[in-house]
């Protein structure tokens, strides 16, 4: 489960994922919902943003299936393909769009800091990802470090610098994890 809420406006997001790994392979199904409140929502008339509304043609949910594969422990590159198959990811004519996202991740460590390099692409036209053809939409470098607070508690901090060449945009995400 993952969620977020912007302080300055009405946007909020709740994502629920069920995943299973077997050997080098993994599968996942994720329910994304990020429509937030109707107030100030430019899509409020097109979808029913009630979290518990699950009609495929009017829901604000996006349901995605994903497959991933990790090459090996010695070369830990992972490859994932995710496709929206149900919900709000629609073409102009109302048909399902099947927007897809492919991501390569390579974890490594430098001086006790866990790092992860990411390349993400949208392989074809997708209104959801805002691209009309193949596009690189995610170049990122993430870092994680456990900060020892006491002999029995460490606080995992993380930072991620994200570039989106397709939209000429960038983001910085900072946070901590509670276990």
Label every model-predicted segment.
Residues 1-7, 27-35, 50, 76-87, ...:
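Transmembrane beta-strand segments that form the barrel wall of outer-membrane beta-barrel proteins
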Residues 10-12, 36-41, 86-92, 126-130, ...:
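Outer-membrane beta-barrel proteins
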Residues 106-108, 141, 168-179:
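Outer-membrane beta-barrel "beta-signal"
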């Amino acid at each position: 489960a993952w969620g977020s809420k912007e302080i300055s406006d009405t946007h909020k997001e709740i994502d629920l994922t069920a995943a299973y790994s077997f050997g080098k392979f993994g599968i996942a199904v994720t329910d994304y919902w990020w429509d937030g409140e109707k107030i100030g929502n430019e899509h409020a008339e097109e979808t029913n943003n009630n979290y518990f509304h699950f009609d495929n043609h009017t829901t604000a949910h996006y349901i995605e299936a994903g497959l991933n594969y990790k090459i090996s422990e010695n070369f830990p590159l992972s490859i994932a393909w995710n496709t929206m198959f149900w919900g709000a990811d629609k073409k102009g004519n109302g048909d399902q769009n099947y927007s897809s996202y492919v991501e390569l991740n390579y974890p490594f460590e430098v001086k006790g800091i866990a790092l992860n390099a990411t390349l993400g692409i949208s392989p074809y036209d997708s209104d959801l990802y805002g691209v009309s053809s193949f596009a690189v939409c995610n170049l990122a470098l993430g870092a994680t470090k456990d900060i020892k607070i006491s002999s029995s508690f460490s606080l995992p901090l993380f930072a991620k610098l994200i570039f989106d060449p397709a939209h000429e945009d960038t983001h910085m995400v900072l946070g901590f994890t509670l276990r």
